[in-house]
């Protein structure tokens, strides 16, 4: 599933081609996504794009009359095409722009979303989200306060959008390794110093992944069709049985709630 770096990479890739241009019309070939594509999107016509923003894993296209909310789901990606090209099997939505470009949404598993809202504030998919991990609001003091009484393992707690948004399975595993914290540790057992370190490394890991265009494991592509290159720098995720790059101990993989967790027994306590 695309996580925060992949969504931010997509945002940065499409923004220069959309802002200042006008959506001439939308082409919806298959509106049966996670939720049905909003009727307003089918009717889009002559709508200038004012901004392209991100909140958590949602892309937000600001138009004069409202907002398009896009979620990439499990396998979605956005590409900028130089012109209208024949669609392939999983190309479900196009935005045809006044500058000749086309924003094309591809989603083999159709678990993404294209929604419309007049106002972002209070929209049900955005209403209960925690702070952005790259913002000043997310820091060690905040994390420690939220962990103090939490009797659950730290890894699933990091992946809870009410605590902090956008830290999915890949980056939770990588950040806990970088901080030397075992993923099964109770959140309440973390000291303030450990929370300060963890908050710092989460930011560093996410920023490094954004620099590398995100992580491509299967479906994700950048807006220019290239993969994300952070996969080459993964320390633990997807490396079961391979030697730890720090100590040489084989990487362990376990499963919790049907999500894979990767860690080093020696480096993470």
Swiss-Prot record:
GO BP of this protein: base-excision repair
Annotated catalysed reactions: Hydrolysis of DNA containing ring-opened 7-methylguanine residues, releasing 2,6-diamino-4-hydroxy-5-(N-methyl)formamidopyrimidine; 2'-deoxyribonucleotide-(2'-deoxyribose 5'-phosphate)-2'-deoxyribonucleotide-DNA = a 3'-end 2'-deoxyribonucleotide-(2,3-dehydro-2,3-deoxyribose 5'-phosphate)-DNA + a 5'-end 5'-phospho-2'-deoxyribonucleoside-DNA + H(+)
Record has Nucleus as a keyword: no
Zn finger (FPG-type) location: 235-269
Domain of life: Bacteria
InterPro entries per record: DNA_glyclase/AP_lyase_DNA-bd, DNA_glyclase_Znf_dom_DNA_BS, Formamido-pyr_DNA_Glyclase, FPG_cat, MutM-like_N-ter, Ribosomal_uS13-like_H2TH, Znf_DNA_glyclase/AP_lyase, Znf_FPG/IleRS
Positions of the catalytic residues: 2 (schiff-base intermediate with dna), 3 (proton donor), 57 (proton donor), 259 (proton donor)
Family: Belongs to the FPG family.
General function of this protein: Involved in base excision repair of DNA damaged by oxidation or by mutagenic agents. Acts as a DNA glycosylase that recognizes and removes damaged bases. Has a preference for oxidized purines, such as 7,8-dihydro-8-oxoguanine (8-oxoG). Has AP (apurinic/apyrimidinic) lyase activity and introduces nicks in the DNA strand. Cleaves the DNA backbone by beta-delta elimination to generate a single-strand break at the site of the removed base with both 3'- and 5'-phosphates.
Name of the protein described by the UniProt record: Formamidopyrimidine-DNA glycosylase
Protein source organism: Escherichia coli O6:H1 (strain CFT073 / ATCC 700928 / UPEC)
């Amino acid at each position: 599933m695309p996580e925060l770096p992949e969504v931010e990479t997509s945002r940065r890739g499409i923004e220069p081609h959309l802002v200042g241009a006008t959506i001439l019309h939308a082409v919806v070939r298959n509106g049966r996504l996670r939720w049905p594509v909003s009727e307003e999107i089918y009717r889009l016509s002559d709508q200038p794009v004012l901004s392209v923003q991100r909140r958590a894993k949602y892309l937000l296209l600001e138009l004069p009359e409202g907002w398009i909310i896009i979620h990439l789901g499990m396998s979605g990606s956005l590409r900028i095409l130089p012109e209208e090209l024949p669609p392939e099997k999983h190309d479900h939505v196009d935005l045809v722009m006044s500058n000749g470009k086309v924003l094309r949404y591809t989603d083999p598993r159709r678990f993404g979303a294209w929604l419309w809202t007049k106002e972002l504030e209070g929209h049900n998919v955005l209403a209960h989200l925690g702070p952005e991990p790259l913002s000043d609001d997310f820091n060690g003091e905040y994390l420690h306060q939220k962990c103090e009484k939490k009797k659950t393992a730290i890894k699933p707690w990091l992946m809870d959008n009410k605590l902090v948004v956008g830290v999915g399975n890949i980056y939770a595993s990588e950040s806990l390794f970088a901080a030397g914290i075992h993923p099964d540790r109770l959140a309440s057992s973390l000291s303030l110093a450990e929370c300060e370190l963890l908050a710092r490394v989460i930011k560093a890991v996410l920023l490094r992944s954004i620099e590398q265009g995100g992580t491509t494991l299967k479906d994700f592509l950048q807006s220019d069709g290239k993969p994300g290159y952070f996969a080459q720098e993964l320390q633990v995720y997807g490396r079961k049985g391979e030697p730890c790059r720090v100590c040489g101990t084989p990487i362990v993989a376990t499963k919790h709630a049907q999500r894979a967790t990767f860690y080093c027994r020696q480096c993470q306590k």
